[in-house]
């Protein structure tokens, strides 16, 4: 039905209504048209001036879900289960093959329409308990379908909603009344001023449709940032606000020396196994190392030193030479701390990095072989565990995380070490959000850092907060070839506001 015909019918009803108004929902029902078509006619009339007045109203309405519509036609699952049972009964295994039996069986049992005989010959068998039933679920759904939801009490409607058979929706409609310039005759308004109108002068006698400056225009084509990049930018901004300097993280390939040995991680540690680490085939080995530093690392591993007993094993340079895809960005931190140790005079520093790391892990909904690590490092004289907790509280507060707990943990290269937990309001439980600790003397002193210098460090992944922020449950929907590009186009700006 064309908009102009609907507009004429609306005006005629106002004319015949003795100054009473017209409800667009009622008009749509009377004319058997979609409500949005009537709304379109109202909008068109509003553009003509003061012909009508329209007041927007909101009301609640109950609608059937697709499953509810099916039940309104063929009956509830429990009724169909009852009707499927012959008088002599039916094996439960056969009954459960029916598509509606999974829900219908339990409902029919709770209604005491059927019973289950587990001791029957041939296996558990289901029998009727009553001769006839009344399918009240179907009856209530049919009432709602006919627009008589008020005839169904609230308890029953909530039960139907719990079963996902109905939904309560908010419906916006208009109450239309006559305007100051009301008329039943509609003069066509021009939408374009043409060269012919100007040449002939006919534009003087024509009425032009006014511009709607509130109308939404066509969105311009532009680039879009992936949610990971948006959250990464927000994290980076937080670090910069706290006075941190970003570390260069362009080396995806690291030697095992910088990735493991320099961090006082023993060569027999399970994390260095091929089941957890990607080893390079070509070039397989690194050849350039600061040899004096390498010898000090070898000694602290095999013999101990700096107040440590070490690990007491035969340290192998061949194992340290193996090239790998870095398993953490702490390898970058190790290089930066070594560089810091060789400055003429020690100066306190605050470093951070956000970049990719690689683990040979089993892929699932929350784990990938490639992901991002966020890391913060603070080096200064006299730092303590209390300083670490203070920095962490400030950092996570800027992320909007204020409820924190710290739990003792073990890391090869930090002591003491702490896992950081935050209370998740949605899950109603404490969840791990990061790991932290003070770098061990066995890591710092071989580098050449002064003995009174302590280094705080902590890290977390980028993917987990991004998934939480954007409500993504499967990491494959965030990263990889299955990413829905529309999600990238529509994702809002990331704001990690402090509470």
Swiss-Prot record:
SUPFAM superfamilies attached to this UniProt entry: Class II aaRS and biotin synthetases
EC number: 6.1.1.20
One cellular component term from this protein's GO annotations in UniProt: cytosol
Entry keyword set: Aminoacyl-tRNA synthetase, ATP-binding, Cytoplasm, Ligase, Magnesium, Metal-binding, Nucleotide-binding, Protein biosynthesis
Binding site for Mg(2+): 415
Catalytic activity: tRNA(Phe) + L-phenylalanine + ATP = L-phenylalanyl-tRNA(Phe) + AMP + diphosphate + H(+)
Family annotation (InterPro entries): aa-tRNA-synth_II, aa-tRNA-synth_II/BPL/LPL, Phe-tRNA-synth_IIc_asu, Phenylalanyl-tRNA_Synthase, PheRS_DBD1, PheRS_DBD2, PheRS_DBD3
Chief site of localization: cytoplasm
MF GO annotations: ATP binding; magnesium ion binding; phenylalanine-tRNA ligase activity; tRNA binding
Binding-site residues for L-phenylalanine, renumbered to this chain: 330, 373-375, 413, 439
Class of this enzyme: ligase
A Pfam family the protein falls into: PheRS_DBD1
Cofactor(s) demanded: Mg(2+)
Domain of life: Eukaryota
Biological process, per Gene Ontology: phenylalanyl-tRNA aminoacylation; protein heterotetramerization
Subcellular location(s) of the protein: Cytoplasm
Coiled coil: none
Assembly mode: Heterotetramer; dimer of two heterodimers formed by alpha and beta subunits.
Stated family: Belongs to the class-II aminoacyl-tRNA synthetase family. Phe-tRNA synthetase alpha subunit type 2 subfamily.
Name of the molecule in the record: Phenylalanine--tRNA ligase alpha subunit B
Gene: farsa-b
């Amino acid at each position: 039905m064309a908009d102009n015909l609907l507009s004429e019918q609306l005006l005629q009803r106002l004319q015949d209504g003795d100054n009473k108004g017209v409800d667009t929902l009622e008009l749509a029902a009377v004319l058997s048209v979609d409500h949005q078509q009537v709304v379109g006619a109202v909008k068109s009339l509003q553009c003509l001036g003061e012909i009508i007045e329209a007041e927007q109203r909101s009301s609640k309405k109950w609608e059937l879900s697709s499953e509810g519509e099916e039940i309104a036609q063929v009956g509830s699952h429990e009724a169909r289960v009852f009707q499927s049972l012959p008088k002599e009964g039916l094996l439960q295994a056969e009954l459960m093959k029916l598509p509606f039996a999974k829900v219908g069986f339990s409902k029919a049992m709770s209604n005491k329409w059927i019973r289950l005989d587990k001791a029957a010959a041939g296996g558990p068998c289901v029998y009727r308990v009553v001769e006839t039933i009344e399918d009240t679920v179907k009856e209530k759904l049919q009432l709602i379908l006919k627009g008589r939801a008020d005839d169904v009490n609230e308890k029953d409607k909530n039960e139907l909603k719990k079963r996902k058979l109905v939904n309560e929706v908010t419906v916006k409609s208009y109450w239309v009344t006559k305007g100051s310039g009301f008329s039943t005759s509609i003069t066509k308004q021009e939408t374009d001023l043409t060269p012919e109108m100007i040449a002939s002068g006919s534009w003087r006698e024509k009425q032009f449709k006014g511009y709607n400056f509130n109308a939404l225009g066509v969105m311009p084509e532009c680039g879009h940032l992936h949610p990971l990049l948006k959250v990464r930018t927000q994290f980076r901004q937080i670090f910069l606000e706290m006075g941190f300097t970003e570390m260069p993280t362009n080396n995806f390939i690291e030697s095992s020396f910088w990735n493991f040995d320099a961090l006082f991680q023993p060569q027999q540690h399970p994390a260095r196994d091929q089941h957890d680490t990607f080893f390079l085939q070509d070039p397989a080995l690194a050849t350039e190392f600061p040899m004096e530093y390498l010898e000090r690392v070898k000694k602290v591993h095999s013999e101990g030193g700096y107040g440590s007993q070490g690990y007491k094993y035969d340290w192998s340079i061949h194992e340290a030479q193996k090239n790998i895809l870095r398993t953490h960005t702490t390898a970058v931190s190790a290089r930066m701390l070594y560089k810091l140790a060789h400055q003429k005079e020690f100066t306190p520093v605050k470093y951070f990095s956000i970049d990719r790391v690689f683990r040979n892990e089993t892929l699932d909904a929350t784990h990938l072989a490639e992901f991002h690590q966020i890391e913060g490092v603070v080096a200064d004289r006299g730092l303590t565990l209390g300083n670490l907790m203070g920095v962490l509280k400030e950092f996570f507060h800027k992320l909007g995380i204020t409820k924190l707990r710290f739990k003792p943990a073990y890391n090869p290269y930090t002591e003491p070490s702490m896992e950081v937990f935050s209370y998740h309001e949605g899950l109603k439980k404490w969840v791990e959000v990061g790991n932290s600790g003070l770098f061990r003397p066995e890591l710092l002193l071989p580098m050449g850092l002064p003995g009174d210098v302590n280094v705080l460090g902590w890290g977390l992944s980028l993917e987990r907060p991004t998934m939480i922020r954007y409500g993504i449950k499967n990491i494959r929907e965030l990263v990889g070839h299955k990413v829905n590009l529309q999600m990238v186009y529509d994702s809002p700006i990331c704001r990690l506001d402090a509470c």
